[in-house]
Amino acid sequence: MNKHALLNADMNYLAATLGHTDEVTICDAGLPIPAQVKRIDLALTHGVPSFIATVKVWLATSQIEGIVLAQEFADVSPECHQALLAEIEAEQQATGRTFSVEYISHEAFKQRTGHSRAVIRTGECTPYANVIFKTGVVF
């Protein structure tokens, strides 16, 4: 059994097989997931697991170098948006690295998920609570 926080086998495999610049999406319960992209569905019920809890575990598992967000996220769901940015800031402080933050339209975001290695679906029901992580390197 793993000693670290991530117990989900599919997410562990994903993290172990990612290469530099690969993208992974963590999304709310409602984001459409392209048929050709691997779906890792964690959603149990409304809000479980939460978007932020899932992000925290992913950040503890995988090295990132940037994120992509929908422009609408900050305006429609400011509390969740700020919580995500706080997690990103904490990760930057912990790693001593600076991550890029890119905002695109929600429509462009949905199209971009088609390039993700996987989409991790949470039970989050907050509008636009979605992030694309760009994978970095640990060296």
Swiss-Prot record:
InterPro entries: D-ribose_pyranase, RbsD-like_sf, RbsD_FucU. The keyword Transit peptide does not apply. One of its GO terms (molecular function) is intramolecular lyase activity. It is found in: Cytoplasm. It catalyses: beta-D-ribopyranose = beta-D-ribofuranose. It is an enzyme of class 5 (isomerase). The active site is at H20. Pathway: Carbohydrate metabolism; D-ribose degradation; D-ribose 5-phosphate from beta-D-ribopyranose: step 1/2. GO terms for cellular component: cytosol. Keywords: Carbohydrate metabolism, Cytoplasm, Isomerase. GO terms for biological process: D-ribose catabolic process. Substrate binds at D28, H106, Y128, A129, N130. Its EC number is 5.4.99.62. Its main location: cytoplasm. The keyword Transmembrane helix does not apply. NCBIfam families: PRK11797.1 (NF008761). Homodecamer. Catalyzes the interconversion of beta-pyran and beta-furan forms of D-ribose. Belongs to the RbsD / FucU family. RbsD subfamily. This is D-ribose pyranase. It comes from Shewanella pealeana (strain ATCC 700345 / ANG-SQ1). The gene is rbsD.
